[in-house]
Amino acid sequence: MTEQRPLTIALVAGETSGDILGAGLIRALKERVPNARFVGVAGPRMQAEGCEAWYEMEELAVMGIVEVLGRLRRLLHIRADLTTRFGELKPDVFVGIDAPDFNITLEGNLKKQGIKTIHYVSPSVWAWRQKRVFKIGRATDLVLAFLPFEKAFYDKYNVPCRFIGHTMADAMPLDPDKNGARDVLGIPHDAHCLALLPGSRGAEVEMLSADFLKTAQLLRQTYPDLEIVVPLVNAKRREQFERIKAEVAPDLSVHMLDGLGREAMVASDAALLASGTAALECMLAKCPMVVGYRMKPFTFWLAKRLVKTDYVSLPNLLAGRELVKELLQEECEPQKLAAALLPLLANGKTSHAMHDTFRELHQQIRCNADEQAAQAVLELAQ
């Protein structure tokens, strides 16, 4: 940044979640430095905020080993080209947003050229492949972390890291409107309500849906008024779930929803879900939950040896204890899942205590992440 040249920030986002984060960061930076310039790899939201897209984000948004191998030459070309062009541009700061397999190497290339680098969103190095922390430390001047235990992990290895809070915690109210959500979904205010979220990936839906449906059948024996909501991320997952339901529980009445996962969580007395970001969202929705997860036996055996944390769900990792029940592999079966959910549907002491802890954890990670990220970028640009 000089008198002649405006503040110049280079960014690379590789998927929709990164595009959303990038747009929020650009917005917060423009409020402080209206004439700043933003360039890089951007999706529609970042471009709408004024980011010049040298490449479209879709170029990087490939999933799965086969797809990555098929596009490898193109991905390597893009990374080499960005290394050259950013090297010539000399931005004040480079921000790699998530997409660690692409961005961390790029960050390292740029840092060698004297460009300051930030990695925005920590990979799960605290959970597995922990040695990646050394590569991240060499490649970046700063990591921006969503969660406090991530910063504690980086501190242990003397890698500069700033905890900025979680954007999802900023977006969701501390006290959600349960009856308002029920009105949206057509659920009576006085009914018991259970949300089933068997995951967003095909393999998860295939592995979990039957047990989740059988669990709901057991719970309806205790609560005949039980309303069951099943938000599904897209038409493919809905079709898959409908097929499994027709085989396992054809007579069980459920509300299948296209999207509306957040509304389903807010409306429900309890949720049964696969692990992942959904567990964090459910915590922020203040919906008591049970986590059920299954994977192929060899994958689970491998995961047990690679994963270095005591828990799989983010609420438990944040709390540092088993706040929500995690039933994995053989434990993830209808009788045990139903037994864990029953006290939550009773809306008694157990669910109230869980709700209060969820609220405390929400406050801990509600720190205005966009503003914090913008502040970190500007401090590094000085």
Curated annotation (Swiss-Prot):
Pathway terms, separated by semicolons: Glycolipid biosynthesis; lipid IV(A) biosynthesis; lipid IV(A) from (3R)-3-hydroxytetradecanoyl-[acyl-carrier-protein] and UDP-N-acetyl-alpha-D-glucosamine: step 5/6
Q: Does the keyword Ribonucleoprotein apply?
A: no
Q: Name one GO biological process term.
A: lipid A biosynthetic process
One family name in Pfam for this protein: LpxB
Q: Which reaction does it catalyse?
A: 2-N,3-O-bis[(3R)-3-hydroxytetradecanoyl]-alpha-D-glucosaminyl 1-phosphate + UDP-2-N,3-O-bis[(3R)-3-hydroxytetradecanoyl]-alpha-D-glucosamine = lipid A disaccharide (E. coli) + UDP + H(+); a lipid X + a UDP-2-N,3-O-bis[(3R)-3-hydroxyacyl]-alpha-D-glucosamine = a lipid A disaccharide + UDP + H(+)
Name the UniProt key words of this record, in alphabetical order.
Answer: Glycosyltransferase, Lipid A biosynthesis, Lipid biosynthesis, Lipid metabolism, Transferase
Q: Which residues form a coiled coil?
A: none
**Record-linked InterPro entries:** Glyco_trans_19
Q: What is its EC number?
A: 2.4.1.182
Query: According to its record, what are the GO cellular component terms?
Result: membrane
SUPFAM superfamilies the UniProt entry points to: UDP-Glycosyltransferase/glycogen phosphorylase
What are the recorded GO MF terms, alphabetically?
Answer: lipid-A-disaccharide synthase activity; phospholipid binding
CDD domains assigned: Glycosyltransferase_GTB-type
Protein role: Condensation of UDP-2,3-diacylglucosamine and 2,3-diacylglucosamine-1-phosphate to form lipid A disaccharide, a precursor of lipid A, a phosphorylated glycolipid that anchors the lipopolysaccharide to the outer membrane of the cell.
Q: Which HAMAP family match?
A: LpxB
Report the family membership.
Belongs to the LpxB family.
Q: What is this protein called?
A: Lipid-A-disaccharide synthase
The organism's lineage is: Bacteria, Pseudomonadati, Pseudomonadota, Gammaproteobacteria, Enterobacterales
